[in-house]
Regions:
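Small-residue-biased structural context
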Residues: 1-142
Length: 142
C-alpha cells in the first residue's frame, strides 16, 4: 500500500508543477517502502540511502524551481510560500541527520509518514493558487 496517490492531491493548472508533484509522490512512496524494509533488514541500507538522496535532491530542485518562477512572475505570496518550503526542508534535513548520525531510522519513517498530510494541504492551499497565477502569467507572455 502506498502512503499517497497522485489522485489525492489537487490538479495543477501548470503541467510542469503537476508532473513534478507526481514524480515526488512516487519517490516518497519508494522511500517509505525502503525505510520500512531497512528497519527489518539492514541489508537495504545502500538502496535506502540512494533513494533518500534522490528524494531530497528532487524536493530541493522542485522548491527552487517554484521559487524561481514565483520571483520571475512577481507572485505576491512568494515569501510565505518559500517559508513553507524552507520549513519542510529543515524538517527533512533534521530527520535525515538523526538517522545518518545516530542510526534512528524511526525519524525518517515518522517524517515520511507525516508528509502526505503536509503535501496534500500545501498543494491544495499554496501550490494550486500559485500554479493558477503562474499559468495565467505565462499565457499572457505568448
Amino acid at each position: 500500500m502506498r502512503l499517497l496517490y497522485p489522485e489525492q492531491v489537487a490538479y495543477m493548472d501548470l503541467e510542469e508543477m503537476q508532473e513534478i508533484h507526481e514524480d515526488e509522490i512516487a519517490l516518497l512512496n519508494e522511500v517509505d517502502k525502503l525505510a520500512t524494509q531497512y528497519s527489518k533488514d539492514s541489508t537495504k541500507l545502500d538502496e535506502l540511502e540512494a533513494k533518500l538522496d534522490e528524494y531530497i535532491a528532487h524536493v530541493t530542485e522542485h522548491f527552487k524551481n517554484e521559487e524561481r518562477l514565483m520571483e520571475k512572475y512577481d507572485f505576491h505570496a512568494y515569501e510565505m510560500h518559500k517559508m513553507a518550503h524552507d520549513m519542510f526542508l529543515m524538517d527533512l534535513g533534521f530527520a535525515t541527520k538523526m538517522w545518518r548520525e545516530h542510526g534512528d531510522i524511526d525519524k525518517i519513517i515518522r517524517f515520511i509518514r507525516k508528509s502526505p498530510e503536509w503535501i496534500i494541504m500545501h498543494i491544495a492551499s499554496v501550490d494550486s493558487p500559485t500554479a493558477t497565477y503562474l499559468a495565467q502569467k505565462m499565457a499572457e507572455e505568448k
